[in-house]
Amino acid sequence: MSSKSELESLLNKIVKSNDETEVSKALKEIEDNNEYIEKKQLRSLLTMHDKKFKDQCLIPMNNLYVKYNDIVGKDRNLQNETAFVDRDIRVLESTLQYIIENKNSHNTNHGGCNKTKNSSKDKLLDK
């Protein structure tokens, strides 16, 4: 039993010891370095990066925005205009398809009897 109590007392002495060991010195140095890195170096690195980012990216982009903003402002309704053009194209395609189908059904119903030679309408519809 004395060996168990002796081990516990040695363990308590080691755990509660105020004496610095090589390991505790290394740990303290690591913690101090970490604090220095986070408080000093990281902040200066972020500041430097922010300045570089602003100089290389943000300021040129802002200059382009200022330069071309008036041109873009005139084209704000471009999407609406393209929607109207797209709609008109679809209407024309549907109309042309309807005419072609109507012509084909007319020719099959009448056997092509009413067809005139080289009619300009037929040439247009054949295209």
Curated annotation (Swiss-Prot):
| Transport found in the keyword field | yes
Q: Which GO terms describe its biological process?
A: endosome organization; regulation of protein localization
Q: Identify the stretch(es) annotated as Disordered.
A: 103-127
Polar residues composition-biased segments:
105-117
Q: Which UniProt keywords apply?
A: Endosome, Transport
Compartments, as annotated in UniProt: Endosome
Organism superkingdom:
Eukaryota
GO cellular component annotations, sorted alphabetically?
A: BLOC-1 complex; endosome
- Give start-end of the signal peptide: none
Q: Record keywords: Ribosomal protein included? A: no
Q: Which family does it belong to?
A: Belongs to the BLOC1S1 family.
Q: What does this protein do?
A: Component of the biogenesis of lysosome-related organelles complex-1 (BLOC-1), a complex involved in endosomal cargo sorting.
Query: What subunit structure does UniProt give?
Result: Component of the biogenesis of lysosome-related organelles complex-1 (BLOC-1).
Q: What is this protein called?
A: Biogenesis of lysosome-related organelles complex 1 subunit BLS1
Report the source organism.
Answer: Vanderwaltozyma polyspora (strain ATCC 22028 / DSM 70294 / BCRC 21397 / CBS 2163 / NBRC 10782 / NRRL Y-8283 / UCD 57-17)
